[in-house]
Amino acid sequence: MKLSDFDFNVPNALIAQYPSSERDNSDLLIAGTKHIKTKFYNIIDYLKEGDLLVFNNSKVIKAKLHLGKNITINLNKKLSDNCWGAFAKPARKLNIGDEFYFDTHKIIITEKLAMGEIKVKFILNNISMIKFLDKYGEMPLPFYIKRTSSVCCSNMALFCDHDNTLKITSISHNSNTVNFRSTDSMIDSTNDNDRYQTIYSQIEGSVAAPTAGLHFTKDILDKLKTKGINTAFVTLHVGAGTFLPVKTENIHKHKMHTEYCSITAETAEIINKTKQKGRDIIAVGTTTLRTLESSCNNGIVKAGNFETDIFITPGFNFQIVDMLLTNFHFPKSTLFILICAFAGFKEMHALYKYAIKEKMRFFSYGDATLLYRKV
């Protein structure tokens, strides 16, 4: 199939810039011969006792850093204790050896790769990487969610968004060195630090949120337990590559970035027992689905830590997941291609057409849909 087969138009007005007033107050579209539009807090009505919801418990880190010169980097993947792969915008303004200072801490550009990808080295002064990012970084919101503005004046610039404020205190043009200091002024009116994180996130490492889980509240999790619906957790650290476009018309020539996954023995056991009993496995998000389908062999989920670059396209043989809870995805994206593989090409085009007609909210902060595997 061609990339153009997965194209459709989403009106800009439907791209959610902010989350719903409450996590579970977003809309939920149940796919079927007759689609059902309801509120997310009603999802329990569409699940059965003995079913298993599998969540991705990865936690989003503040992976976006301002380097000055109107340059930002989004960390993508940890390569070693102090080295990371990242995406720079615009990368053309960076040179190997450039140094950027955040108070007494330093970032060095060590390598430039294709498509804006770079490698950086962190030299930190008595601070952990996570604490450094908590202090100087920002939530890595997707590019289509608009928050940041900048005001530049001679050799000083102020970067401000609704979560955090960073100030460049000096720029040394000769040495390509930029000095930063953090400020105590935190602007959090949109609450992105909270709402771009699932309530059950535990293991730090994602640079984009597994957004299907953003709708869940403690109340919903409690009600699932009361109804006898089981839960389990896997880990997939979402990389910045999740936002990279497919650039080949032949979709099978697209290469996915690798992402770290982990499945505990306890989780593997409960999934396999659920399958043996003939109950449904519901993946909360495409990251969970990709983790489960990457880990299985002959219908059995294997525990362990591994990396996956799985790209699921129509014709894929799903072995584990029966239902998929996910948000609405970009046209011509790997994730829209995935749901077409899972729930049917014609069916997903029709579902999205219906969602647009109903003015449902799209993408990371948007509404959710519950899909059934096409058999």
From Swiss-Prot:
GO terms for biological process: queuosine biosynthetic process; tRNA wobble guanine modification. It holds the Pfam family Queuosine_synth. Keywords: Cytoplasm, Queuosine biosynthesis, S-adenosyl-L-methionine, Transferase. Its main location: cytoplasm. One of its GO terms (molecular function) is S-adenosylmethionine:tRNA ribosyltransferase-isomerase activity. Its EC number is 2.4.99.17. InterPro entries: QueA (IPR003699), QueA_dom1 (IPR042118), QueA_dom2 (IPR042119), QueA_sf (IPR036100). It catalyses: 7-aminomethyl-7-carbaguanosine(34) in tRNA + S-adenosyl-L-methionine = epoxyqueuosine(34) in tRNA + adenine + L-methionine + 2 H(+). One of its GO terms (cellular component) is cytoplasm. It comes from the Bacteria. Pathway: tRNA modification; tRNA-queuosine biosynthesis. It is found in: Cytoplasm. Monomer. HAMAP family: QueA (MF_00113). Transfers and isomerizes the ribose moiety from AdoMet to the 7-aminomethyl group of 7-deazaguanine (preQ1-tRNA) to give epoxyqueuosine (oQ-tRNA). This is S-adenosylmethionine:tRNA ribosyltransferase-isomerase. The lineage of its organism: Bacteria, Pseudomonadati, Pseudomonadota, Alphaproteobacteria, Rickettsiales.
